[in-house]
């Protein structure tokens, strides 16, 4: 399901189950649900933009079960910007699950811990190498990092500063792999800020491609049965692409969504099946073993 009739359709759709071709009555079967996931990135909340998305957040909560925020949610990484966001999104956070990853802008002012605390205090789940589950769907999230794509991905060669840069990209990839490995759900969703493939940054100047994402992030996505990937960062990129194994990737940068779907709500909505919920291993549980 995409944008067309999004307000008219119901959120949850029980389906009839069969075993060996024999229908099972709903009272005797595990009822599967379709979960609607909305995603957007690069809101860049700052002084003067408060109130801009309040109506949109309300509309999203009317038609989606879960909202993903894929980084650069605020502009300069200031706590006051986070408070403006929470003022607009607080009612939505009471109605539906909101899951987020940070982007590069959240780090600009060196107050990222305070920003995270404000967002978490307002009911937003922040993922940074962790896994979580909501309504039977699994989510793995990291910020990601630059580094380039394909055969031109930056290698750890030469100056120590280059090696540290590549190490950061590798670490983000390993964090994503660890998070995906913890999930035991029918559907898995990966949310990032930086792009895992080149296809969804097409449209940006070629000179900045290495700073828009890194194909090292694609490796763990291909290794696990991921239903979809969402990212942002490339405001002038391409909305949709696929990994080398065919997994759909959506660039949900706000500016790109507004250009791709003019007059529509500022989000991309997909539907995924929800299986019986099984708890994901948390980072704390892993550390305690």
Question: Residues of each region from the PLM?
Answer:
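Cap/insert and terminal regions of metallo-dependent hydrolase folds
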Residues: 79, 84-89, 195-224
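Binuclear metal-dependent phosphoesterase catalytic core
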Residues: 6-9, 24-26, 31-34, 117, ...
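Metal-dependent catalytic neighborhoods of phosphoester/phosphodiester hydrolases
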Residues: 49-52, 71-90, 102-122, 150, ...
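Conserved catalytic scaffold of divalent metal-dependent phosphoesterases
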Residues: 43-45, 113-209, 253-254, 272
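A general structural detector for well-ordered alpha-helical segments in enzyme core domains, enriched
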Residues: 56, 60, 84-89, 115, ...
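N-terminal active-site segment of His-dependent metallophosphoesterases
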Residues: 2-97, 106-110, 162, 166, ...
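Active-site neighborhood of phospho(di)ester-bond hydrolases with catalytic His/Asp-centered motifs
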Residues: 39-41, 67-72, 99-104, 125-129, ...
């Amino acid at each position: 399901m995409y944008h067309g009739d999004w307000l008219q359709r119901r959120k949850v759709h029980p389906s009839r189950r069969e075993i060996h071709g024999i229908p099972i009555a709903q009272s005797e079967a595990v009822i599967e649900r379709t979960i609607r996931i909305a995603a957007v990135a690069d809101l860049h909340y700052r002084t003067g933009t408060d109130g801009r998305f309040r109506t949109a957040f309300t509309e999203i909560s009317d038609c989606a079960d879960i909202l993903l925020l894929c980084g650069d949610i605020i502009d300069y990484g200031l706590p006051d910007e986070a408070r403006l966001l929470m003022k607009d999104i607080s009612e939505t956070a009471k109605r539906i699950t909101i899951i987020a990853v940070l982007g590069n802008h959240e780090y600009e002012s060196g107050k990222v811990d305070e920003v995270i605390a404000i967002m978490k205090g307002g009911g937003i789940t922040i993922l940074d190498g962790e896994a979580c589950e909501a309504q039977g769907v699994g989510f793995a999230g990291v910020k990601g990092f630059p580094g380039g794509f394909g055969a031109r991905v930056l290698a750890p060669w030469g100056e120590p500063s280059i090696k540290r840069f590549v190490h950061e990209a590798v670490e983000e990839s390993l964090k994503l792999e660890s998070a995906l490995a913890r999930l035991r759900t029918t559907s898995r969703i990966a949310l990032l800020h930086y792009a895992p493939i080149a296809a969804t940054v097409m449209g940006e100047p070629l000179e900045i491609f290495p700073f828009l994402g890194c194909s090292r992030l694609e490796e763990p996505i291909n290794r696990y049965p991921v239903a979809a990937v969402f990212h942002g960062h490339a405001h002038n990129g391409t909305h949709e692409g696929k990994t080398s194994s065919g997994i759909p990737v959506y660039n949900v940068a706000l500016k790109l969504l507004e250009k791709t779907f003019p007059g529509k709500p500022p989000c991309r909505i997909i539907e995924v099946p929800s299986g019986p919920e099984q708890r994901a291993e948390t980072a704390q549980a892993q550390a305690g073993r």
